[in-house]
Amino acid sequence: LAVCVSLIGAANIPPQHLNLYQFKEMIRYTIPCEKTWLEYTDYGCYCGYGGSGTPVDALDRCCYVHDNCYGDAEKKHKCNPKMQLYSYKLTKRTIICYGAAGTCERIVCDCDRTAALCFGNSEYIERHKNIDTKRYCR
């Protein structure tokens, strides 16, 4: 399984988008080279904005778990996951999160790390891209 590594810097990314940029980079590191991270933004019932119903497959479950992880970070730890910056390293086909355990930096990084690794280990089923969520996600 080939892995793509991005060398793009974050210097010109506005601060309000840096966490999503970091998550995107994690995803790009773990998914097959023939896929782009954008293919994961409207997949199943949970990959992308919002989510409802039962996940359609293992990949969609990765997004469901990620959504819940962000929800827990907000409710239990008073974090703002979409704005939270964190330190991490992409190395040897895995992702290492830095920061003290229990801090928002570490909690959010762990959410993104877990999801990205899950994406890399889950089959991408083309028919679950852009599904009719009103019909399949109840």
From Swiss-Prot:
Transmembrane segments: none annotated. The keyword Translocase does not apply. Keywords: Calcium, Disulfide bond, Hydrolase, Lipid degradation, Lipid metabolism, Metal-binding, Neurotoxin, Presynaptic neurotoxin, Secreted, Signal, Toxin. It holds the Pfam family Phospholip_A2_1. Disulfide bonds join 45-137, 47-63, 62-118, 69-111, 79-104, 97-109. Residues 11-18 form a propeptide. The keyword RNA-binding does not apply. Residues 1-10 form the signal peptide. The active site is at residues 66, 112. GO terms for molecular function: calcium ion binding; calcium-dependent phospholipase A2 activity; phospholipid binding; toxin activity. It catalyses: a 1,2-diacyl-sn-glycero-3-phosphocholine + H2O = a 1-acyl-sn-glycero-3-phosphocholine + a fatty acid + H(+). Its cofactor is Ca(2+). Belongs to the phospholipase A2 family. Group I subfamily. D49 sub-subfamily. Heterodimer; disulfide-linked. The A chains have phospholipase A2 activity and the B chains show homology with the basic protease inhibitors. Snake venom phospholipase A2 (PLA2) that inhibits neuromuscular transmission by blocking acetylcholine release from the nerve termini. PLA2 catalyzes the calcium-dependent hydrolysis of the 2-acyl groups in 3-sn-phosphoglycerides. This is Basic phospholipase A2 beta-bungarotoxin A-AL3 chain. It comes from Bungarus multicinctus.
